[in-house]
Amino acid sequence: MSPKAVVFAYHDIGCVGLQALLGAGYEIAAVFTHADDPKEKTFFGSVAQLCARHGIPVHAPEDPNHPLWVERIDKLAPDFIFSFYYRQLLGDPLLACAKKGALNLHGSLLPRYRGRAPANWVLVNGESETGVTLHQMVKRADAGPIVAQQRVSISSTDTALTLHGKLREAAADLLSETLPLLALGQLSGTPQDETRASCFGRRTPADGLIDWSLPATQLYNLIRAVTQPYPGAFCAVGENKLIVWAASAEAGNNGEAPGTVISHDPLRIACGEGSLVINAGQRGDNGLYLSGAQLAREFGLVEGSQLLDTEKRRPARRTRVLILGVNGFIGNHLSERLLQDDRYDIYGMDIGSDAIERLRTKPNFHFIEGDISIHTEWIEYHIKKCDVVLPLVAIATPIEYTRNPLRVFELDFEENLKIVRYCVKYNKRVIFPSTSEVYGMCQDASFNEDTSNLIVGPINKQRWIYSVSKQLLDRVIWAYGQKGLQFTLFRPFNWMGPRLDRLDSARIGSSRAITQLILHLVEGTPIRLVDGGAQKRCFTDVADGIEALARIIENRDGCCNGQIINIGNPDNEASIRQLGEELLRQFEAHPLRGNFPPFAGFREVESQSFYGKGYQDVSHRKPSIDNARQLIGWTPGIELSETIGKTLDFFLREAMAEKADMR
């Protein structure tokens, strides 16, 4: 009996995949594709037309993961599900419909170049080899075990179009070899080496902007990566646009500044290293395809001309970022990161300034001490004045959720709602700190921003008031987004690092877990493990988290507009007990260890006695970070032990300073 397949396919590779399945004797029960985008140049074959010629049922749903489609696919009882250049991720319920496996064909040699547009990216980066990979599908994009690969060499003259042709041939060869073996159950997968993984996001036309300060070879690679049928690399000549379709790199730039015309026939431009000869291009989006020499005449370029637009000649205005809660953990680290380059002016408000004293002398840092519930006129004025608003003020410690639930609601929801409405009023971009807490008691193995259910406990468990306050604001912001509000929601997962909070906060129970544990070590009291400390969390170094947040603020090509992004480290999962044990190990080895009492042991306590009757806990909280990888090219890299060490060192030095002050 022929194996039955359901296929998700688009592009030439989609056609190749379908033809290979038919050639291998597979029964294709249904095909899912995309309707062509009228704004996109469709230089590739049509999956829908191929299906029509073969009488194969074809569909183009907006959401293939909708339960109705999953139910229909499940009824087809496919042995296999295949994805060939289909542009949407397929969820676990859909993948589970395949009795023998779900496989994807990806256009690179995985684990390198996961994500979008791998053929373009390998050219941009000057690679000499790529390939195609058939791999098992898992929830995380392009991360499943590898079934088969075929290598493709990249020549120095390849363009995106010629490389695509090579990949198409390689895909046909790979599938013709592997599909019969797959049907016989003779192929298995090899896990990917995560240490070699790289991930790239989608490319947009704006990514084709030519920066003449770069080496000529790098610009040549960019041009061939995005030349026709893609939108092309471009630069400005005065107020006009020059699209470069063909070029070559040469050594030497005659000592000229980047962007200077060295000669007009051939049209040769000085680069940061070497020079670029423009062989062909066009003027504007609707111009004729012209030689470089004719382009020089059309633009009036002569030796010594500068390819700089009028905007580049003006000093760029810094982006004005308003941070409410600037003295807090995220606020002070974020300010420090943004002030490291000269693109931002930071305006901040908070009720204290101890964590930002080191920043107050910076010329681009502007601080006022104030309360967001009182200084509303200052806040409204600065929202109107600034470009980006981050309302970071919140009560975010679990004991306060049960101890002061109304105060949590008033501050975390009501005061922040006012700020959101000011952003709507003045059409300002808001980057709102949602929270991993919104996932509540979700049972997914990892929490996905777009598909995971947000589940909380009964009303008498006041612990959830923080979660639902944040969730409701997420929903309000999303609704305003449908009316034009520019926004991004980010969800931090257990960020840790220096200046997390204060030992004094831990003394009254109002601090994060690691600060409580360190306080016990400092004071020689037993480390209290709530419900045995079996709860697992994924801890994220603040430096990793802030880098992701900085990229969200940068928002290159609008990639983060209207998005929800988890920022966490799924590889740094540990139970609270394991966190305490690692803290103890590093504490005993720390140079300051001799200044503190002996370790008093671990003590298990019941959660209601520690937090109160309104508390309820969750067993795990692990983020999916596919959105962060694909939208902002972010992957965390700092191991948990390093983060624990930095955090411990900060608090031990704080404790020593307290002792010195008491003398």
Curated annotation (Swiss-Prot):
The record marks D142 as: Raises pKa of active site His. The keyword Lipid metabolism applies. The active site is at H106, E437, R621. NAD(+) binds at D350, D371, I372. It catalyses: UDP-alpha-D-glucuronate + NAD(+) = UDP-beta-L-threo-pentopyranos-4-ulose + CO2 + NADH; UDP-4-amino-4-deoxy-beta-L-arabinose + (6R)-10-formyltetrahydrofolate = UDP-4-deoxy-4-formamido-beta-L-arabinose + (6S)-5,6,7,8-tetrahydrofolate + H(+). One of its GO terms (biological process) is lipid A biosynthetic process. Its EC number is 2.1.2.13, 1.1.1.305. UDP-alpha-D-glucuronate binds at residues 396, 401, 435-436, 463, 494, 528-537, 615. Residues 1-307 are annotated as: Formyltransferase ArnAFT. The record marks N104 as: Transition state stabilizer. Keywords: Antibiotic resistance, Lipid A biosynthesis, Lipid biosynthesis, Lipid metabolism, Lipopolysaccharide biosynthesis, Multifunctional enzyme, NAD, Oxidoreductase, Transferase. CDD domains: Arna_FMT_C (cd08702), Arna_like_SDR_e (cd05257). Residues 317-663 are annotated as: Dehydrogenase ArnADH. Pfam families: Epimerase (PF01370), Formyl_trans_C (PF02911), Formyl_trans_N (PF00551). Pathway: Nucleotide-sugar biosynthesis; UDP-4-deoxy-4-formamido-beta-L-arabinose biosynthesis; UDP-4-deoxy-4-formamido-beta-L-arabinose from UDP-alpha-D-glucuronate: step 1/3; Nucleotide-sugar biosynthesis; UDP-4-deoxy-4-formamido-beta-L-arabinose biosynthesis; UDP-4-deoxy-4-formamido-beta-L-arabinose from UDP-alpha-D-glucuronate: step 3/3; Bacterial outer membrane biogenesis; lipopolysaccharide biosynthesis. One of its GO terms (molecular function) is UDP-glucuronate dehydrogenase activity. GO terms for cellular component: membrane. (6R)-10-formyltetrahydrofolate binds at R116, V138, K139, R140, A141, D142. Bifunctional enzyme that catalyzes the oxidative decarboxylation of UDP-glucuronic acid (UDP-GlcUA) to UDP-4-keto-arabinose (UDP-Ara4O) and the addition of a formyl group to UDP-4-amino-4-deoxy-L-arabinose (UDP-L-Ara4N) to form UDP-L-4-formamido-arabinose (UDP-L-Ara4FN). The modified arabinose is attached to lipid A and is required for resistance to polymyxin and cationic antimicrobial peptides. Homohexamer, formed by a dimer of trimers. In the N-terminal section; belongs to the Fmt family. UDP-L-Ara4N formyltransferase subfamily. In the C-terminal section; belongs to the NAD(P)-dependent epimerase/dehydratase family. UDP-glucuronic acid decarboxylase subfamily. This is Bifunctional polymyxin resistance protein ArnA.
